[in-house]
Amino acid sequence: MNTATLSIVIPAYNSPNWITQCLSHLASALSNAGIPESQVIVVDDGSTDNTGDEAESFTGLNLTVLRQSNLGRFKARENGLALCTGTHVLFLDTRVFLGKDSLKFVLPFLQHPETSLWTADVQANTTGNPIARFWRAIENIFWRRYMNNPRTTSFGLEDFDYYPKGTTALIAPVELIREAISQFVPTVGDWRKVNDDTALLRFAAERTRINISPEYTCTYNARTNLRAFLKHANHRGSVLIDGYLRSGTRLNIPIWSVLILAPFGLYVAFSNLLLALIALAVIPLSVFVLVLSLGVRVKDALVLASLFWPFSIYYLLGMYWGLWLKFGRRNTSSEQL
């Protein structure tokens, strides 16, 4: 008999339409797993709309809505975690829809220590959303060790940087995550800019292996317009610095290389306009050919090449902003703590 019990924590900010759909998919997954009474905690992270009210009006779940000022996802999860009564916690986000049989698959594993920690196989919803194809292409490139051969497997610190992972749809023992959060030291001055995924998962991977399977899946609904995409790209650039600009990570040297060489490339472009115009055309074409050779779908590769320059500019600006937050404003203010 499975002795594992589940609490679900969902940070929510200005997402009244998404939260209802997220909860609906969660209810289906809980029902199919035979645990419909599991504790669900929605943390309204200072929404300026009716997100919290929409969550409270949802029926069919053992649901509590916790309201806080806008402190970001990390603090929302921490405050939600404090209310958890289950042996394990599932972190969800409002744009993430859990697969209907995902919990049914993973639940029997949770009672065994070596299979008690799971990260989801996240599928991007590309229907009518070319921007989602961009992110899927990026994931297929960086996590191709798994993406080219999805299977039930696990990884540890030795191959941590080669597998897709995140705290979205993460299932973990409550006490492990509480310990990870208590040991977490932010490297930026704004909790809303904190990249909790990498630090928390590295902490967990030091103690147990992280499991992943195409049977434990969820769907991510990416932003659908260019403005939101560029804003998100800028944010991802800043949290990349927080999560991976440290010795021992796979991306540490490549990140420093980009940060150092980018100003030089800009100088060359301004010094030789013809060369800059050639680069504007040739580099995206080269990217298209390269990612095709890495197994990326043709349509995804086309979107990646088309958005290469706007993404690169906003992402790079985010990286420099993250560098400033990491080294120029290291102290987190008392108001944010």
Language model: regions and residue ranges:
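Short, well-formed alpha-helical segments that are part of the catalytic scaffolds
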Residues: 15-31
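A conserved acidic beta->alpha catalytic loop
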Residues: 25, 44-53, 96
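Short aromatic/hydrophobic "clamp" motif used to bind/position activated sugar donors
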Residues: 89
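Conserved donor NDP-sugar-binding/catalytic core segment of glycosyltransferases
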Residues: 101-133
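Active-site-adjacent helix/loop segment of glycosyltransferases
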Residues: 219-311, 317-321, 337
